[in-house]
């Protein structure tokens, strides 16, 4: 993992643990080698739920439902979560976990490929969490940004996974297509045009 250890220590110091259900779900997921977010991302998500209090959340990549349940549990505001999962074996497990946690009314699971589902969604989201196939993030980005409410938050897990970074050429190509993907460059261009 590529993270400053001081940052990890700080983020983890904010965390006071999980509910008993989430602790058990995390333990089972790790034992079954199901990929779920690391502790520091769990702490960060909990912090963001309290700070941003999003009412509509989109999650791309459900697995067994751990992250969706964590966001639902630690958001102090009532929220609706739509989560997308493509792996058929995990879908019934996630649905069962939502039911066991009593959150099936707040969390809706859409079954299928996010590349096909995202274009069908129309209502904006306050918060979007991408935790799917990392190689697809750039392909999802145009639709994800279309769905992100103005002032909303986009969080993508494992951008620096195991030392691999988003392909800079692919990112540059996206910036050429739409400068808003590279906000800092677009702002710089506007300033230089004003002079």
Predicted regions and their residues:
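A short alpha-helical cap/connector motif
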Residues: 1-127, 134-155, 159-195
